[in-house]
Amino acid sequence: MKYTLTRIDPDAPVERYPQEQRQTVDDPLAQEATRGIMMGRLEEVLKDTVNWGRKNSLWPYNFGISCCYVEMCTAFTSPHDVARFGAEVIRASPRQADFMVIAGTPFIKMAPVIQRLYEQLLEPKWVISMGACANSGGMYDIYSVVQGVDKFLPVDVYIPGCPPRPEAFLQALMLLQDSIGKERRPLSWVVGDQGIYRPQMPAEKERKRGERINVTNLRTPDEI
């Protein structure tokens, strides 16, 4: 599996992903396994254990911009029970959260605020873009709206819809958990940048294309 190595570069010029450099590399564990089967296997078990704890205790930052935030809050009610995914502990400060959801329209005036809040998140941190406005600007193709938060933030999961249903938010959490379970982060006490290895997850549209092409009996909207 190919991985994307992300490194922090404070001196980098302002680009699409500020303060980050990305490159495609091979699985780092495969390289470590050549040193010895025992040590390679032990490191793999340790990484899987740490990732299991991270993906099952995701604390979201309580932050909303527009109407998609209402659907996000609905996912925290008892009919949907987001606590099943360990993401019910909403934090009022980004310094105590694991990920943030950009739920709403990212106006240009809000972009510096969103970026500042993202920088206050402690590593490891993730971003979910929720709704058409956050993904691509939606119907607001105007001067005052950023055409997608990925213009100034690294996004891990995109949720389509205007607005998305709460079930879509829960699916995004499961996709994020799947991605976190395959991440490779350094297991050492060294303070400083050592890089983050993230798997290249396929788009759901591409993953389900074959299944959708093979459908012969189309269901009506009330049956979906």
From Swiss-Prot:
[4Fe-4S] cluster binds at residues 67-68, 133, 162. GO terms for biological process: aerobic respiration; electron transport coupled proton transport. Residues 214-224 have a biased composition (Polar residues). It comes from the Bacteria. It is a peripheral membrane protein. It is an enzyme of class 7 (translocase). GO terms for molecular function: 4 iron, 4 sulfur cluster binding; iron ion binding; NADH dehydrogenase (ubiquinone) activity; NADH:ubiquinone reductase (non-electrogenic) activity; quinone binding. Its cofactor is [4Fe-4S] cluster. One of its GO terms (cellular component) is plasma membrane. Binds 1 [4Fe-4S] cluster. It holds the Pfam family Oxidored_q6. Keywords: 4Fe-4S, Cell inner membrane, Cell membrane, Iron, Iron-sulfur, Membrane, Metal-binding, NAD, Quinone, Translocase, Transport, Ubiquinone. Residues 201-224 are annotated as: Disordered. Its EC number is 7.1.1.-. Residues 203-212 have a biased composition (Basic and acidic residues). It catalyses: a quinone + NADH + 5 H(+)(in) = a quinol + NAD(+) + 4 H(+)(out). NDH-1 is composed of 13 different subunits. Subunits NuoB, CD, E, F, and G constitute the peripheral sector of the complex. NDH-1 shuttles electrons from NADH, via FMN and iron-sulfur (Fe-S) centers, to quinones in the respiratory chain. The immediate electron acceptor for the enzyme in this species is believed to be ubiquinone. Couples the redox reaction to proton translocation (for every two electrons transferred, four hydrogen ions are translocated across the cytoplasmic membrane), and thus conserves the redox energy in a proton gradient. Belongs to the complex I 20 kDa subunit family. This is NADH-quinone oxidoreductase subunit B. The gene is nuoB.
